[in-house]
């Protein structure tokens, strides 16, 4: 193996630049030529390849976003699009790929490998922490810290005005951000996709948890698949308990921004190195992850098809500290 190419795809996550940096530096350490593919699969199709040396990735470990940009590619979904991408891979003489992203990224990489046998090792880059094969994903810790900073500020105004705040965080299919943010922010409840929402449970908890000395509450809501989910839930509660002053805050894309935390920088650096060394060991069609502090490699098909369960220890911690389960 002489040449590798690195790309980011799908939703951005803090720490992607740290992972790019690590992959590039690891490649040069092992005497490889390293290219970056700008704008993910679209860039692969259009031949948007740039050579990356160590200087090109200096001073990026602390930056959010991705210097290689990211884009969702409809064309790559088609056999014709993937053929164009393969032609560009051959043109530049690329022997192996490093893919940084989530489920969509690895679905594309799986298809591409099955058709053209270009070795690819992935690194999990998504704030949702929803990928099977790694305890944590790049960007998750930073996103939780971003949420926590907002929760702490909202708690101040919620207490001052004795309000109930529903704070919506990202997480379409999983409640990892919601649960960890709720625990670290001392929230009274978290509503997550793993468990069916029951408005009567929320109503009863608020009814029995509100008193003359405790009238403010913070409820964290994972966005799920329904747009404006926190607003919908807030309306349910307001109709049932009109005496409560209910407010909604949607944190949105602020969770994806900002410089990565120390934990994400270290995680991304470990995974960037692991992708390159995985390629050199002859691995292909796998994602590098960290489980129990050790590097592991999981087939893309498993990361795509297997569901990563919510951490039961986190749920147990929340229940014991809060006196109630998050299973609402």
From Swiss-Prot:
Keyword entries, A-Z: Allosteric enzyme, ATP-binding, Cytoplasm, Glycolysis, Kinase, Magnesium, Metal-binding, Nucleotide-binding, Transferase
Active-site annotation: 128
Record's GO cellular component terms: 6-phosphofructokinase complex
Annotated Mg(2+) binding sites: 103
Alphabetized PROSITE patterns for the sequence: PHOSPHOFRUCTOKINASE (PS00433)
The keyword Mitochondrion appears for this protein: no
InterPro entries hit by this protein: ATP_PFK, ATP_PFK_prok-type, PFKA_ATP_prok, Phosphofructokinase_CS, Phosphofructokinase_dom, PKF_sf
TM annotation in the entry: none
Pathway: Carbohydrate degradation; glycolysis; D-glyceraldehyde 3-phosphate and glycerone phosphate from D-glucose: step 3/4
EC main group: transferase
Top-level taxon in the UniProt lineage: Bacteria
Binding site for substrate: 126-128, 163, 170-172, 223, 247, 253-256
Binding-site residues, ATP: 11, 72-73, 102-105
Co-factor(s): Mg(2+)
Known catalytic reactions: beta-D-fructose 6-phosphate + ATP = beta-D-fructose 1,6-bisphosphate + ADP + H(+)
Function: Catalyzes the phosphorylation of D-fructose 6-phosphate to fructose 1,6-bisphosphate by ATP, the first committing step of glycolysis.
Family (UniProt): Belongs to the phosphofructokinase type A (PFKA) family. ATP-dependent PFK group I subfamily. Prokaryotic clade 'B1' sub-subfamily.
PANTHER family reported for this sequence: ATP-DEPENDENT 6-PHOSPHOFRUCTOKINASE, PHOSPHOFRUCTOKINASE
Protein name, per record: ATP-dependent 6-phosphofructokinase
Gene: pfkA
